[in-house]
Amino acid sequence: MAAPTDTFEFPRTGKTAPNRAVVAAMTNKQSNEDGTLSDEEINWLTRRAEGGFGIVTTAATHVVPEGQGWDGEMGVWGDHQLPGLTRLATGINEHGAISLAQIFHGGMRCPQRLTGVQPVSASINSTG
């Protein structure tokens, strides 16, 4: 059995994490209204890598504007988000850790006040 301090290689990519310690995806609601990362969120996640985690996972990140599930959720759907995402990945990788994004779509739970559109679902659901 592998120890938590053992390296871990992802077979498909060949990337190697320095250890098996993983920051789980946690909702911290620190992103800006347009889905861009705030300095606070970048700093918080980067500090996990600096502290020795081998893999740092982001909070849920919506892949389309209408998939946002709550206030403060980061997005990965627009070019305007790339500078912050690049800064985050670079900061994590500089400490030898691997960065992972938890992709997400809020489905029928997306608040219309955030998305501006009626929520979508894979099946017919009652809204009341």
Predicted ranges, named:
Residues 1-106:
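N-terminal capping/small domains of soluble enzymes
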Residues 90, 94, 98, 104-128:
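Non-globular sequence segments
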